[in-house]
């Protein structure tokens, strides 16, 4: 599956990835060293996460992050 993250909020991106994994917020959080409240806050766009967190998620859940220049 593939998404264009420019079409989503940061929170929606985290939620989509978590749903792909089939994990609860608590289990997803544990998988990346974050708490359930942190994952909830990410998904609701209440707190920001950095590229380090996104890279950690990608590595842990076998995802590829691609940046492509628009034509």
Language-model segments: which ranges?
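DNA major-groove recognition helix of helix-turn-helix/homeodomain DNA-binding modules
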Residues: 50-67
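Recognition helix of helix-turn-helix/homeodomain-like DNA-binding domains
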Residues: 33-47
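Residue-level recognition of specific faces of alpha-helices
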Residues: 13, 38-41, 53
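N-terminal flexible/basic segments that precede or flank functional cores
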Residues: 1-8, 62-64
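Short basic helix-loop element that most often maps to the first helix and adjoining turn
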Residues: 12-27, 31, 56
């Amino acid at each position: 599956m593939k998404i264009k993250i420019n079409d989503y909020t940061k929170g929606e991106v985290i939620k989509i990835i978590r749903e792909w994994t089939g994990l609860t917020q608590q289990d997803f959080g544990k998988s990346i060293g974050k708490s359930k409240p942190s994952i909830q806050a990410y998904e609701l766009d209440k707190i920001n996460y950095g590229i380090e967190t996104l890279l950690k998620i990608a590595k842990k859940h076998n995802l590829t992050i691609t940046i492509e220049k628009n034509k």
